[in-house]
Amino acid sequence: MEVGSAVKNFDVGDQVFFYRKFSDIGTWAEEITINALDVAKIPANTSTEEAGGVALPLLTSYDALQQLNAKVGEKVLIHGAAGGVGFQATQLAIKMGLEVIATAGERDFEVLQKAGVKSITNYKTQDFAQEIPQQGIDYVFDTVGGEVLK
C-alpha cells in the first residue's frame, strides 16, 4: 500500500472509508487507486462496524443529493429528516446551500433546528401534505417510503 506524493492528510496504515459509485470498477478489489478527495479517516477508537454505520447513511445521502443537480437556494423536502439517512441528508443539503423543509416528530425538532433547519412539520400531528405545498418545494428526499407520500 502507498499514499500518493501529493497527498498530505493520509498515511500508510490509516483506517479509512471511501466513496465510490457502485457502478465504478474496483470496489470489490483488495487494492484500488482512489482520489484522496473521496476518502475519509475513520476516527481513532472507532470500530469498522461503527464507521460503516456512519458511512452508509452519509454516502447514501450524498449520492442521492448529487443526482439532483440542485442549485443553491432551491428547496428540498426531507421526509424523516431526523432518521439515520434523513439527518445526514439534512446536513449535506444545508452545506450544499439548499433550503431544507423537514418532517419529523416533535422530539427531534431541537436537533434539526440546531443543524440549521428553519421549517419543520410534525408529521405525527400535522397534515404535512397540506402544510408543505404552501411553501413550494423543488425536490423530495423520502427516507420513510410506503404510503406516506401518496
Where are these regions (language model features)?
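Glycine-rich phosphate-binding loop and adjacent beta-alpha segment
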Residues: 110, 143-150
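NAD(P)H dinucleotide-binding glycine-rich loop of Rossmann-like/cofactor-binding domains
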Residues: 15-80
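Short glycine-/small-residue-rich Rossmann-like dinucleotide-binding loops
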Residues: 4, 125, 144-145
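Mid-domain Rossmann-like dinucleotide-binding core that forms the NAD(H)/NADP(H) cofactor-binding site
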Residues: 54-125, 131
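Glycine-rich beta-strand-centered segment in the early N-terminal region that forms part
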Residues: 1-23
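N-terminal Rossmann-like NAD(P) cofactor-binding module of classical short-chain dehydrogenase/reductase
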Residues: 17, 121, 138-141
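Short, structured coil segments at secondary-structure junctions
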Residues: 35, 115-116, 135
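A short acidic, Gly/Pro-enriched loop at the edge of an enzyme's catalytic core
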Residues: 131-138
